[in-house]
């Protein structure tokens, strides 16, 4: 039995929150704590919460309650932690509460209730790239915190603050450690990836810096070029449609980063986009998509949209459907508008009844499923590189360059017994079949 204190840990929410959890776990292990996956035997439990939408808030509150019931000693951090009063009202017995990315405060509270061990065997087991909660062959890389936009449906800036970009040197150093440790795919995340380093320009701090003895600029294009030189797949998420995003497409065409753009557009009605405080020129967006595909024919476009936003008429919704038909996006997520405490849109007039939201959601998804199915069918007969995520007796499950883990489709490979393969390996697969979301193929 180890003499090191045991810390239980619950991580909720998005990949950005997962990165925060990984950092806290790394610091816990570096300080000699043992991380366990159960309440029983834990000297303390940390719950890293999500507070983006009401369902996430409810899940976080329930997880806190479960930890209290089964253990009793609980520290809360994460996005919902920015609303301490809301947590205390339901769970007053929580020991301490901090907001998101409050790593030092979390560790200070842990030390207060469970003193740091004088010696622990776990301190020597921390890998150079830190503790990761993802499979060994891919990892999330957070490049900034916060967001300068004030979209009316979102409360992230009130929780995570304004844009705060990391140093390009620190990001590249972390990325190199990941690749050196065997990571084959780096998933770049933030609240607003395309805004990377724009805050430093405002502060006149975007000067040339040195990495590996060479001068480099502290900007998004340079970051992507350098990440692409490390030898791993590089996938960009949460890209706001700034004009300079156009400059990323040639890098994708050249194979420096994956030809994959996760660009949340949210709607297509100029009226609704204006109410959301989002960019409103859909004609311009369609022109850009056409140009992007001319430069990089293999480009995969993923986006997310909201239906049932306050004031959305049938005409507004039809504009959204028309846009989907014309844009022919590859991967699309759809959310029914959900009131969030603190969001401007929650108090707007003309809230849409739930039954209309539901009906529009289904119409949206029916159309997009047809589009996605047709775009996937176009891949039948092609031989594509596939990264292996799972291997079992039934076959291989992997992903193409067009598929991010968790949110996109997969490739099922049946005849894997003909060759020896391992997790994280990138193999060539000939596509034989497709449906609305997934592909099937053979080696």
UniProtKB/Swiss-Prot annotation:
Keyword Metal-binding attached: yes
Pfam families reported in the protein's UniProt record: Radical_SAM, TRAM_2, UPF0004
SMART domains per the UniProt record, alphabetical: Elp3 (SM00729)
Residues involved in [4Fe-4S] cluster 2 binding: 147, 151, 154
Main localization, broad class: cytoplasm
MTTase N-terminal domain segment(s): 5-115
GO CC terms, sorted: cytosol
Positions contributing to [4Fe-4S] cluster 1 binding: 14, 50, 79
GO molecular function terms attached to this record: 4 iron, 4 sulfur cluster binding; aspartic acid methylthiotransferase activity; metal ion binding; protein methylthiotransferase activity
Entry EC no(s): 2.8.4.4
Subcellular localization: Cytoplasm
Catalytic function, reaction form: L-aspartate(89)-[ribosomal protein uS12]-hydrogen + (sulfur carrier)-SH + AH2 + 2 S-adenosyl-L-methionine = 3-methylsulfanyl-L-aspartate(89)-[ribosomal protein uS12]-hydrogen + (sulfur carrier)-H + 5'-deoxyadenosine + L-methionine + A + S-adenosyl-L-homocysteine + 2 H(+)
Alphabetical keyword list: 4Fe-4S, Cytoplasm, Iron, Iron-sulfur, Metal-binding, S-adenosyl-L-methionine, Transferase
NCBIfam families per record: 30S ribosomal protein S12 methylthiotransferase RimO (TIGR01125), MiaB/RimO family radical SAM methylthiotransferase (TIGR00089)
Function, in words: Catalyzes the methylthiolation of an aspartic acid residue of ribosomal protein uS12.
Protein name: Ribosomal protein uS12 methylthiotransferase RimO
């Amino acid at each position: 039995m180890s003499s090191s204190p045991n810390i239980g840990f619950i991580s909720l929410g998005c990949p950005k929150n997962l990165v925060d959890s990984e950092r806290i776990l790394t610091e816990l292990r570096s300080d000699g704590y043992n991380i366990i996956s159960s309440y029983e035997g834990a000297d303390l439990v940390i719950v890293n919460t999500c507070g983006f939408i009401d369902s996430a808030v409810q899940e976080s509150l329930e997880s806190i309650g479960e930890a209290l019931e089964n253990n009793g000693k609980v520290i809360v951090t994460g996005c919902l932690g920015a609303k301490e009063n809301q947590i205390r009202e339901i769970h007053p017995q929580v020991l301490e509460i901090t907001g998101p990315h409050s790593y030092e405060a979390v560790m200070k509270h842990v030390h207060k209730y469970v003193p740091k061990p004088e010696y622990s065997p776990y301190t020597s087991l921390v890998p150079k790239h830190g503790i990761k909660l993802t499979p060994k062959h891919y990892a999330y890389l957070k490049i900034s915190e916060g967001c300068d936009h004030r979209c009316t449906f979102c409360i992230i800036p009130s929780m995570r603050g304004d844009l705060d970009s990391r140093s390009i040197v620190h990001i590249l150093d972390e990325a190199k450690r990941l690749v050196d440790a065997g990571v084959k795919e780096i998933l770049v995340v933030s609240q607003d990836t395309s805004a990377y380093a724009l805050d430093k320009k405002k502060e006149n701090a975007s000067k040339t810096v040195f990495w590996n003895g060479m001068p480099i600029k502290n900007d998004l294009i340079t970051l992507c070029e350098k990440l692409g030189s490390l030898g791993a797949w590089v996938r960009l998420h949460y890209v706001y449609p700034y004009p300079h995003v156009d400059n990323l497409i040639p890098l994708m065409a050249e194979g420096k980063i994956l030809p994959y753009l996760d660009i949340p557009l949210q709607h297509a009605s100029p009226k609704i986009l204006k109410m959301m405080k989002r960019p409103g020129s859909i004609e311009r967006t369609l022109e850009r998509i056409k140009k992007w595909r001319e430069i990089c024919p293999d480009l995969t476009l993923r986006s997310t949209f909201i239906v049932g936003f306050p004031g959305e008429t049938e005409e507004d919704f039809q504009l959204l459907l028309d846009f989907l038909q014309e844009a022919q996006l590859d991967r699309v997520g759809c959310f029914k508008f959900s009131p969030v405490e603190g969001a401007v849109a929650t108090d707007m007039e003309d809230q849409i009844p739930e039954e209309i939201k539901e009906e529009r959601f289904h119409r949206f998804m029916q159309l997009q499923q047809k589009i996605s199915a047709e775009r996937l069918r176009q891949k039948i007969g092609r031989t594509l590189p596939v990264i292996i995520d799972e291997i079992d007796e039934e076959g291989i499950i992997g992903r193409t360059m067009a598929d991010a883990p968790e949110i996109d489709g997969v490739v099922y490979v049946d005849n894997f017994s003909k060759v020896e393969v391992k997790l994280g390996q990138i193999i060539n697969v000939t596509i034989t079949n497709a449906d609305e979301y997934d592909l099937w193929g053979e080696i």
